Amino acid sequence: GVDYQYSDGAYYLLSRVVTELSGEKLDDFLRSRLLMPLHVREAAFSKCPMGYPIGATGMYVRTEDMAKLGEVYQNGGTFEGKRLLSKEWVELVFEREYELAKMENGGHCKGGMNGQMLYLSPHGRVIAWQSYDPEGKGNTLMELILKNE
C-alpha cells in the first residue's frame, strides 16, 4: 500500500487473513515461525469471542522476549544466524516506519499499551521495558535514554 493508518480493526482482519491463508490461527502461526525460534517460553494472546487472536493487541510476552524481537530487527531479520523475517520486510518497516517510529537521534521505538516500550538504538543496542503507566507519563525513561545515547 501507499498509505498506512493504524486501525485495530485492520489488524483483526489481518489475523483472520493469516488464518485463512495458512490454516493456522495467528497465535499458532507466530509461535511456530517466530516465538519458538526466539526461545520464547511463554506467550499469551487475547482472543475474540470466536477464539481468534485479536491481532491489534493482546500478545503478552516477558520483557526479555520483547527485546529479542528488537534484536531481530536490529539484525536485519535474523536471530542466532537464522532468518525469521525477510530482509525486504525489515527494510520496509524502518523505511516506512511500520510500527517502529523513527526518533530524532536515528533510533526507532515502539510503544505499547500502559507503558510497554521497545527502543532500538542507532548504535545497535536494544532496550525493552514494561511498566504500568496508564496515565502515559512514562516518557521520563525514554528522555533519559535519549539524553545518554
Residue ranges, per PLM feature:
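Solvent-exposed, flexible loop/coil residues
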Residues: 8, 44, 48-49, 58, ...
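Active-site-proximal alpha-helical segments within enzyme catalytic domains
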Residues: 10-17, 55-78, 116-132
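Stable alpha-helical elements in mature extracytoplasmic
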Residues: 10, 22, 26, 30, ...
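Catalytic loop of the DD-peptidase/beta-lactamase superfamily, centered on the K-T-G motif
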Residues: 36, 74-149
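Homeobox/homeodomain signature
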Residues: 16, 25, 35, 49-51, ...
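Carbohydrate-binding/catalytic loop surfaces
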Residues: 48-61, 105-115
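Short, charged low-complexity intrinsically disordered segments located at boundaries
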Residues: 18-23, 48, 61-67, 97-106
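Catalytic-site signature segments of enzymes, centered on catalytic residues
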Residues: 1-57
